[in-house]
């Protein structure tokens, strides 16, 4: 998974407020696109097609599995255990 180098520094202001960024809702849209809402009230659409590589993420290229995404306590996850850090999702 490619993570932007400035990810941590960009998320610090939110952490300074005593809050940890997390996903509160997810909706499957089409292909590998998801509509996400975060606990800071910001939402948007992420396209994860280019992020589906590696042992945990390759199975998600099967759209029937990708569509089974759900929200955990902080982020999104799939039945095979694959997940993305909420900070990463917020930045893409």
What are the residue ranges of the model-derived segments?
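Motif-centric detector for short Cys/His coordination patterns
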Residues: 1-92
